[in-house]
Amino acid sequence: MPEKMAYVFVNMVTHADIKLVRSLADKRARTETGLFVAEGAKLVEEICSSTLTINRIYCTGNPVAHPAAEQVSPKEMERMSLLKTPTDVLAVVEIPKYRLDPSIFSRKLVLALDDVQNPGNIGTIIRLADWFGIEDIICSEATADCFNPKVVQATMGAILRVRVHYTDLTATLKSAAAAHTPVYGTFLEGENIYSANLTRTGIILMGNEGRGVSDRNAQYVSRRLFIPPYPATRHGSESLNVAIATAITCAEFRRRG
């Protein structure tokens, strides 16, 4: 957090302010304004200490030491909040713009998401990436928006440390494959992940919750990986949740060093 400073807080919140915050629950409004909402004292404190630009902070309790802070009543916070249970601090933040550098594929391990739809899954995957030191995630344009309020909350602050890129995923994978970048994908059939030879760099592609990796992207996967059940002959669940599969996959890659 920046050094504590004294600010005079005047209740100036307007109907237009509340309307703007509420509108940011919708992806179209986030795209048009370039803004997203973050709620909760811990998350907002992390944002204040990050490189992200804060547009406005609203608080009901102890004032937040930031020039953009404004004190509001609990009733006003309830009207603004996008959560079922409002917190005492809400920030409107500028969406960061990142440039995707294709050279990272030969230098780092990168996650790729193929039309993953559930906000909870996206949030968990971003948090996992942060835990396992994966700094970049590339997403198909149909993947759920990482600045959806539910995703932002689910990341527990990891959204500040992981760069999420929305792009033409098929074209990106095609270029990576042409450059001989290892492209791993998780499938119901393939090499046993626990015995497969894994590299320290490349792309790990995770598929949609219902259909898995799409055919248009599967053609560029050079290494198909399979997470086996236990015992191997067991017949039970058809597949793993994509966030759980991501956790297992990232853990195994990092375990190898």
Description of each model-found segment:
Residues 185-237:
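Active-site/ligand-binding-proximal alpha/beta "capping" segment
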Residues 69-94, 98:
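Glycine/small-residue-rich loop that forms an oxyanion/phosphate-binding "nest" at active or ligand-binding sites
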